[in-house]
Amino acid sequence: MTVRTRIAPSPTGDPHVGTAYIALFNLCFARQHGGQFILRIEDTDRVRSTAESEQMILDSLRWLGLEWDEGPDVGGPHGPYRQSERGDIYAQYAQQLLDAGHAFKCYRTSEELDELREARKAAGLHLALKPADLALPDDEVARREREQWPYVVRMKVPGEGSCVVSDMLRGEIEVDWAQVDAQILLKSDGMPTYHLANVVDDHLMGITHVMRGEEWINSAPKHKLLYEYFDWPMPTLCHMPLLRNPDKSKLSKRKNPTSINYYRRMGFLPQAVTNYLGRMGWSMPDDREKFTLEEMMANFDIQRVSLGGPVFDLEKLTWLNGVYIREDLDDAALLQALREWAFNDAYVNQILPQVRPRISTLSDVMPLAGHFFSGVPPLEASSFDGIKLEHETLLKLLQFLTWRLEGVSRWEKDVLLDDVKALAEAFDMKMKAFLAPVFIAVTGSATSTSVLDAMAILGSDMTRARLRHAIEVLGGVSKKQAKRFEKEYRQLQV
């Protein structure tokens, strides 16, 4: 048997360090067993998926040195490798489940589903809806079908008992069927959900080992049941521990930068980032901290993965990156790294239009453009003394903008402008006044190049990191304030 593993990211935003972490372990496991590593794109979310995000994923993984044997850009015998191009395949297998009685069409409206869940909640039952809960009288089903109501295809699941799933790291995992819902397999637009698409794709692509984050453990019974319905052999499962913040909370872009693009923009070396990700819950047999990707692949043993919840510590990564710079880069290599980092034509050409109208001598460039070549600006609370806002309003403005930017999938100036305008109107402020503290937070100065252009060039994670830094410099948001801010933010009609 040839070992075949895969990574299947969704192109809905910046490439996440968690994606790179799971990809690294899949790659090392495959190479350790002389196998193949596949990259598949889960782009069934038609609203949020973008070609730009897909390209960023490919570029980021390659930057880290993670190469795949088959994928949307390199091809292979099991394509297409984008789920959006495999719709007919999923429809065929969904129909097979319907014909065999393992799935059913559900015409329930969202309002009816809410009522059913509320009824189960009031009765003290699991909120998972079963086929019996969703059933309609035959004549009502016939009427909705005749009137062409929208429907989804759901899988049938047992109402009682438990499902036992084997895991490479955790042994046998038992999940009560009572907490497993009649999962949607095909959405009303005909696109598959994760559950159907992944089972079908993993089988057709010959995936032998599914190594993914532990957040998918509760979905494993659905996948096992689908393999049984199709009468297919199930791949070996391995649920990896999730990356954690230093406070042990789940790694989240709300607390820390999570984009590979951020670390690349900050000037981290790809070999240092890959090395550090390799230390997430795993160690070399001799426990050394610094090792190459080739050394990790040669010594990889999945049983050495610890389930304790690896901590992604930025200070530790920064230390390791410094070791690489000092020990591995001579002057020529360091100069080349600087060019690749920021002093390259592609990046500088984005900045030149911002500074050209404002300079008289070449030495004027760095004071105007220094924020494009640095991490977070060296701010103090006094940096905001010229902002004529109450302290809490200032914190709220920066926090609301940070949250607003988390939802931006197309990071371009026109989109950012619309979002900032919407928030400025919600605060009943003119754009100039609203942007004044944002200028300082993002560029480190009250006067600089266009802050919206700067945000577009710096990227989403770097921009949000600078906004979070400004909030911290101003004393931070207390837990009490955070709760109030979140409530107010949800109530905003923007």
From Swiss-Prot:
Entry annotated with the keyword Amino-acid biosynthesis: no
Catalytic reaction list: tRNA(Glu) + L-glutamate + ATP = L-glutamyl-tRNA(Glu) + AMP + diphosphate
Binding site for ATP: K253
'KMSKS' region, short sequence motif: residues: 250-254
EC number: 6.1.1.17
Keyword Disulfide bond in annotation: no
Keywords: Aminoacyl-tRNA synthetase, ATP-binding, Cytoplasm, Ligase, Nucleotide-binding, Protein biosynthesis
Motif ('HIGH' region): 9-19
Class of enzymatic activity (EC top level): ligase
Subcellular location: Cytoplasm
GO terms for MF: ATP binding; glutamate-tRNA ligase activity; tRNA binding; zinc ion binding
Main subcellular location of this protein, as a coarse class: cytoplasm
InterPro entries: aa-tRNA-synth_I_cd-bd, aa-tRNA-synth_I_codon-bd_sub2, aa-tRNA-synth_I_CS, aa_tRNA-synth_I_cd-bd_sf, Glu-tRNA-ligase_bac/mito, Glu/Gln-tRNA-synth, Glu/Gln-tRNA-synth_Ib_cat-dom, GluQ/Sye
Signal sequence bounds: none
Gene Ontology terms: biological process: glutamyl-tRNA aminoacylation
Lineage top rank: taxon: Bacteria
GO CC list: cytosol
Function, as annotated: Catalyzes the attachment of glutamate to tRNA(Glu) in a two-step reaction: glutamate is first activated by ATP to form Glu-AMP and then transferred to the acceptor end of tRNA(Glu).
Summary of subunit composition and partner proteins: Monomer.
PANTHER family named among the record's database cross-references: GLUTAMATE--TRNA LIGASE (PTHR43311), GLUTAMATE--TRNA LIGASE, MITOCHONDRIAL-RELATED (PTHR43311:SF2)
Entry similarity comment: Belongs to the class-I aminoacyl-tRNA synthetase family. Glutamate--tRNA ligase type 1 subfamily.
Descriptive protein name: Glutamate--tRNA ligase
Gene (UniProt): gltX
